[in-house]
Amino acid sequence: MNQTNFGFKKVDYTKKQGLVNSVFSNVADKYDLMNDLMSFGLHRLWKDEFSRQIPNLNSHILDVASGSGDIALKLAKKARDRGNNIALTLSDINEEMLKNAKKKAIDLNLFQNLKFTVASAEELPFSDNSFDYYTIAFGIRNVPDINKALKEAYRVLKPMGKFICLEFSKVKESYFKDFYKFYSFSIIPTIGQAITGNKEAYEYLVESIELFPSQDEFRIMLKEAGFEEVSYKNLSGGIVAIHSAYKI
């Protein structure tokens, strides 16, 4: 049996995506609030820095694991304010999360030039060489087969297209590492229980962060998927990192 990790648990590979879907469906309504509470609002600064990695908004952008649409809508608003001709495709395997993104787009009057597609990062329903940018924020670690998702990212990008990933990473400083681990494993699930009534969802969250490859390990994975000019930038001491790579 082909097994993979669902948090610290070993599960059949074919069952992981369903388990991940269940996690996000159960917390979808409180997802944005929990992000603010867990990160003390820092996730907004991280996403601002992430969006700055796309200087040319006259582009065709695929946002994978789009969730509630934070990244895509941030880019859409910036493009509208600049008068850029952006084309954005928001993709997520969880339909409930994508519905939230659609609602936010309508509320913000950002629905123009947006497409919404329910799809797996491992099997994207797009042609080869379709996009100028592939973005994914806090989503790659939830994919059952990360290597397969990276190869799909490479496939759908145009030559000279850019892959950009924002993901939780490994804290470097020892003086901060112990506190961060305590906060992650003891405080975050407690907040999750209080706000969403689902402690297990946030136990999975912190376990998936703990198991995600280090910055340098993920850099190697990107190279093995075919990418070149691979680099990363740590934010907040390595709590998160922005990974960039090109399809040459």
From Swiss-Prot:
Pathway: Quinol/quinone metabolism; menaquinone biosynthesis; menaquinol from 1,4-dihydroxy-2-naphthoate: step 2/2; Cofactor biosynthesis; ubiquinone biosynthesis
Binding residues for S-adenosyl-L-methionine: S68, D92
Any GO BP annotation: aerobic respiration
Protein's UniProt keywords contain Transferase: yes
GO molecular function term, any single one: demethylmenaquinone methyltransferase activity
Keyword Cell inner membrane: no
Enzyme Commission number(s): 2.1.1.163, 2.1.1.201
Catalysed reactions, as listed in the record: a 2-demethylmenaquinol + S-adenosyl-L-methionine = a menaquinol + S-adenosyl-L-homocysteine + H(+); a 2-methoxy-6-(all-trans-polyprenyl)benzene-1,4-diol + S-adenosyl-L-methionine = a 5-methoxy-2-methyl-3-(all-trans-polyprenyl)benzene-1,4-diol + S-adenosyl-L-homocysteine + H(+)
Keyword entries, A-Z: Menaquinone biosynthesis, Methyltransferase, S-adenosyl-L-methionine, Transferase, Ubiquinone biosynthesis
Domain of life: Bacteria
PROSITE patterns according to UniProt: SAM_MT_UBIE, UBIE_1, UBIE_2
Role description: Methyltransferase required for the conversion of demethylmenaquinol (DMKH2) to menaquinol (MKH2) and the conversion of 2-polyprenyl-6-methoxy-1,4-benzoquinol (DDMQH2) to 2-polyprenyl-3-methyl-6-methoxy-1,4-benzoquinol (DMQH2).
Record family assignment: Belongs to the class I-like SAM-binding methyltransferase superfamily. MenG/UbiE family.
Protein name: Ubiquinone/menaquinone biosynthesis C-methyltransferase UbiE
Designated gene of the protein: ubiE
